[in-house]
UniProtKB/Swiss-Prot annotation:
Protein topology in the membrane: Multi-pass membrane protein
Organism: Rubrobacter xylanophilus (strain DSM 9941 / JCM 11954 / NBRC 16129 / PRD-1)
A GO molecular-function descriptor: phosphotransferase activity, for other substituted phosphate groups
Membrane-spanning ranges: 275-295, 349-371, 397-417
Protein name in UniProt: Bifunctional IPC transferase and DIPP synthase
């Protein structure tokens, strides 16, 4: 096992409990922390979620059952964690929390390796104050109340934990923010035959300690205990991986196809950047066909490029690989693709109308992107009323694709120019009214 000497740490740390038997997942043939959901093992997903949620301190992974395999996976994948072996793990996961504490800073998160959360839930937890904070969900969507630990709440505090509470107000979401000095007082409660994390929580309440409730209020999360849970968890992850800024074409048409493509890409070595390049290549090929007068085939490839353009973001969000650098890379390729498609359609049409409509169409496409980028750089997030119909790339590409498929390139270019320039003008007028 790796070196276990205590070192100095900055910020909030985390203990990831990964020592249990995972008996109902044994048919998968690997330790539970190494079961895969949407392209990542449960352990990788937990570590990436914590980091993406803003956790900066050391992450301690506590192993027990088949611990050498889990530790080897951490090393092979280059996970930035400290692995700590807990020989006492058969007594319960409470012993894993105690085993991790001496390697952790004063405030730390306790995360279950078999619970899947979004980074936003971690951010919400880290904003809470208290010696013991529990993430709870009063409006669970994915988690099974028959499997999860239930909680009873009073005045924003958890007053009771239990699997079989007849009356309860929410579910324990398996994510906690704790104070190490406070929990050290519970070591004296650790001498029994069994010591689960629920036992420690109840001991904390019995000692007069308060458990602050951090309500996730319907945020997507679930716990994974069975092969069926693995499948349901992947559906959940793909559901939240869709962009929240979809236009109507993406929302009602493209996502239904891109999600199926992304599902097949999750366990491949393809990166989101490579998928961005694939989308650009399809757009460039479609533009070339449009310029050569092959309008129907070119239009079909333009729409396919639009569908694949959604896969890079889905893949990045599902694998927790999103980054500002990747967003800039994708946006730059998109602008080049737009210019090629509009130019190709204008050239391939061979009419004065299409040639004349090419410039305003290209200007409108670029201005929609440019005004949004400048707005958000100077003023923060653009209000959703300025990112609707005509201001989304999916609509623009659908109009251009239809122009090729229906043999109406001039009309498609005129519509694209009108939509884009009208939206850019609307944004400018809104800014002017805001200054006056």
């Amino acid at each position: 096992m790796p070196d276990e000497r205590t070192t100095g740490r900055e910020g909030v740390g985390a203990a990831v409990l990964a020592a249990g038997f995972g008996e109902r997942l044994r048919e998968c043939g690997r330790p539970k922390p190494l079961a895969r959901v949407a392209g990542l093992t449960l352990l990788e997903r937990t570590v990436r979620t914590l980091r993406a949620g803003g956790l900066e301190g050391e992450i301690v992974v506590v192993v027990g059952h088949r611990g050498e395999e889990v530790a080897g996976h951490c090393k092979a994948r280059g996970l930035p964690v400290r692995v700590v072996e807990n020989p006492d793990y058969p007594r319960g996961n409470g012993t894993s929390v105690l085993a991790a504490m001496r390697f952790l800073p004063e405030r730390f998160v306790v995360a279950m390796v078999d619970h899947i959360h979004t980074p936003e839930s971690v951010r919400r937890l880290l904003r809470c104050e208290g010696d013991f904070v529990a993430a709870v969900d009063t409006r669970p969507v994915y988690a099974d109340p028959g499997e999860a630990t239930r909680v009873r709440l009073e005045g924003g505090r958890v007053v009771e934990f239990g699997k079989n509470l007849p009356r309860y107000d929410g579910l324990d979401a398996g994510l906690f923010l704790c104070s190490r000095p406070a929990l050290e007082r519970l070591r004296e409660a650790s001498g029994g035959e069994r010591l689960s994390w629920n036992d420690l929580k109840r001991a904390w309440l019995a000692s007069g300690g308060e458990v602050v409730a951090c309500d996730l209020a319907g945020a997507p999360w679930t716990d994974v205990d069975t092969p069926q849970d693995l499948r349901l968890s992947e559906e959940m992850v793909l559901g939240w991986a869709a962009s929240g800024n979809d236009g109507p074409v993406s929302r009602h048409i493209n996502r239904r196809i891109s999600r199926r493509i992304t599902r097949r890409l999750l366990d491949t070595p393809l990166s989101p950047d490579q998928v961005s390049l694939l989308s650009f290549a399809l757009a460039a090929l479609g533009a070339g066909l449009l310029a050569a007068g092959r309008l129907r085939l070119g239009g079909a490839l333009v729409q396919l490029a639009s569908i694949v353009d959604g896969c890079d973001g889905e893949l990045a969000r599902a694998r927790l690989e999103s980054s500002p650098r990747g967003a800039v890379f994708d946006a730059t390729l998109d602008r080049w693709a737009d210019a090629l498609i509009i130019s190709g359609l204008a050239l391939g049409a061979g009419t004065r109308l299409a040639a004349a409509a090419g410039y305003p169409a290209l200007a409108g496409a670029l201005l929609v992107s440019y005004t949004r980028a400048r707005w958000e750089a100077a003023l923060g997030r653009m209000p959703s009323r300025f990112t609707g119909l005509g201001a989304t790339r999916d609509v623009r590409l659908a109009v251009l694709a239809l122009g090729g498929l229906l043999g109406a390139p001039g009309a498609a270019l005129l519509a694209t120019g009108a939509l884009g320039n009208a939206e850019a003008l609307r944004r400018l007028l809104a800014l002017k009214r805001g200054r006056s």
